[in-house]
A protein has these predicted regions:
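N-terminal accessory segments that target, anchor, or regulate ATP-driven/P-loop NTPase machines
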Residues: 1-14, 62, 162, 166, ...
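C-terminal helical "lid" subdomain and adjoining coupling/linker elements of P-loop NTPases
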Residues: 11, 18, 28, 219, ...
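Pre-Walker A (pre-P-loop) alpha-helix and adjacent loop at the N terminus of AAA/AAA+ ATPase modules
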Residues: 21-64
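Walker A/P-loop
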Residues: 58-96, 123, 190
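Conserved C-terminal "switch" segment of AAA+ ATPases
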Residues: 90-95, 175-181, 187-188, 196-241, ...
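Short glycine-rich substrate-engagement loop in P-loop NTPases that contacts/grips substrate
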Residues: 96-125
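Flexible beta-alpha connector loops of hexameric P-loop NTPases
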Residues: 103-114, 137-148, 193-195
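Conserved catalytic/switch belt of AAA+ P-loop NTPases
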Residues: 136-168, 174, 181-185
Length: 288
């Protein structure tokens, strides 16, 4: 029995996927209110399209490829991973997995290898989302570079596999314009752009305290105040390599190491001290 043509795949709600739980997971993420609104709107459209289809009505064509614009550590990959599962639950994708690549995962150094590499990645991503981080790097190569070849193959694959593949191209705002201009068809393929704002000081603090809590740690009041003041100061003039939530997670990891060293050195601690991150712990580290 031959497999049905991909475009004939019947798209039905996957009742085993708890879409409401996934939406809660999305909406519980710190900050990014505009992102959540945009994605909830997209999902509402897909739900209605599905119901119209079930009632024998015409459904408007929906292109699901997207561009995510924003700095590192603003939640782009996290949102893409949740989105893949939601789209699987809605029947838009047959598997709902996420394949994450950057330029090195698509571009090879010799003639003919790039085509093989891109095709292999596309095959692996079918049924899910292909997330291309720093996609603009594909368009930034020198003459004779194979980045353009990767873009051209990708452009065709997005159209050929649009029934069961979503491509999300992610990166900084300005550089991504070069990527979208690298092939005449790209802008029409990526007809939805979502901007991920940087976190403010209160949101970074929430990310840190939530992560600490998930690891059975709490920050003392003076540690919380110190961290909030530090975030406020850093954001007033952020260093070039500041990674938003990524920097906060790395900072917390180092603070936890400080606490371990402090407790072992003091050698006189109670069980409750194992969960406390103090002012001394957070002051010993710089946020990078």
């Amino acid at each position: 029995q031959p497999l049905p043509d991909q475009k004939e795949r019947k798209k039905e709600f996957n009742t085993e996927i708890d879409i409401q739980a996934l939406l809660k997971q999305l909406n519980d993420l710190t900050g990014m209110q505009s992102v959540k609104t945009e994605i909830n709107n997209m999902i509402n459209l897909l739900k209605i399209c599905k119901i119209r289809q079930e009632n024998g009505l015409q459904t408007p064509p929906v292109t699901n490829h997207m561009v995510f614009l924003g700095n590192p550590g603003t939640g782009k990959t996290t949102v893409a991973r949740i989105l893949a599962k939601i789209y699987h639950g809605l029947g838009v994708l047959s598997k709902g997995h996420l394949v994450e690549v950057d330029r090195s995962g698509l571009v090879a150094g010799y003639m003919g290898q790039t085509s093989e590499k891109v095709t292999e990645v596309i095959e692996k991503a079918k049924g899910g989302i292909l997330f291309i981080d720093e996609a603009y790097a594909l368009a930034n190569g020198q003459q004779g570079d194979f980045g353009q070849e990767a873009i051209d193959i990708l452009n065709k694959a997005m159209e050929d596999n649009r029934d069961d593949l979503i491509v999300i191209a992610a990166g900084y705002h300005d550089e991504m314009q070069d990527f979208l201009d690298a092939n005449p068809g790209l802008r029409s393929r990526f007809n939805r752009t979502i901007e991920f704002p940087n976190y403010d000081a209160a949101e970074l603090l929430e990310i840190m305290t939530n992560r600490a809590k998930s690891l059975d740690y709490t920050l003392t009041d003076d540690a919380v105040q110190y961290v909030q003041d530090t975030f406020t100061r850093i954001l007033a003039c952020p260093p070039e390599n500041f990674g938003n939530a990524r920097s906060v997670r790395n900072y917390l990891d180092r603070v936890i190491h400080n606490q371990a060293n402090r407790l072992i050195t003091e050698n006189n601690f109670k069980e409750e001290d194992l969960t406390k991150l103090t002012l001394a712990d957070v002051q010993s580290e710089t946020l990078e």
